């Protein structure tokens, strides 16, 4: 949503250069920051989540599973009602055109998609979130609010965190992995023990505010 407000306010230089002025969407032209009076983010990964580093194999599998599903459904008639927007990887058909059933199980395209940085999963990493934060500025006419969640309890001896009783059971392994993951830096990004508290998917500290913005 912060990117949405950024586009309304400042537009997109890439879209302006690549699109004729008469065909440019108002979303990318800028000058509409006053359309949004306030923005409330709930458990938003402002600075990314360490789950990708605590459970690398699990998250890699999740990426492959997501793009594989998009490759299958994106080449069926269902793509007309929900566009997976994976055409750049040749994984989905163009909506309102004949589905490319023969393009299902495009393993080469799936691998390229997973290894690229042009997808949501990359934006959720610490490095992807940092890249986004460098592009996004706060609009002076918009009030920003953040609501962060925590469903872990700290062990007084180790300082690590594990799931609390009220957490959804399927999130217990994720919460424990994030809460007990030992690290100091992740490729020059400083991480402290304050990152152990989480809600099962997102580090609580990351849901408070973007690192490069005041709180």
Name each model-derived stretch.
Residues 1-4, 41-43:
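Conserved beta-strand->loop/alpha-helix structural units within folded catalytic cores of enzymes
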Residues 2-10, 21-22, 56:
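Short glycine-enriched nucleophile-adjacent loop
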Residues 8-15, 194, 204-205:
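Amphipathic alpha-helical interaction segments
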Residues 10-35:
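Short mixed-charge
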Residues 28-215:
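Helical cap/lid subdomain of alpha/beta-hydrolase-fold lipid enzymes
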């Amino acid at each position: 949503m912060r990117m949405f407000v950024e586009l309304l306010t400042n537009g997109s230089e890439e879209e302006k250069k690549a699109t004729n002025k008469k065909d440019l969407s108002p979303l990318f032209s800028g000058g509409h920051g006053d359309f949004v009076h306030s923005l409330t983010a709930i458990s938003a990964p402002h600075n990314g989540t360490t789950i990708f580093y605590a459970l690398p194999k699990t998250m890699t599998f999740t990426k492959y599973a997501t793009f594989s599903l998009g490759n299958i459904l994106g080449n069926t008639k269902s793509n007309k009602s929900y566009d997976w927007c994976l055409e750049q990887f040749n994984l989905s058909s163009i909506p309102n055109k004949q589905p490319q059933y023969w393009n299902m199980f495009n393993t080469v395209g799936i691998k390229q998609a997973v290894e690229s940085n042009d997808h949501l999963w990359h934006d959720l990493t610490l490095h992807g979130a940092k890249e986004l934060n460098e592009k996004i500025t706060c609009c002076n006419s918009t009030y920003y609010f953040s609501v962060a969640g925590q469903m872990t309890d700290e062990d007084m001896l180790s300082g690590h965190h594990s799931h609390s009783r009220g957490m959804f059971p399927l999130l217990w392994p994720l919460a424990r992995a994030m809460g007990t993951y030992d690290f100091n830096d992740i490729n020059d990004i400083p991480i402290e023990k304050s990152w152990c508290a989480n809600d099962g998917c997102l580090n609580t500290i990351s849901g408070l505010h973007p690192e490069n913005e005041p709180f």
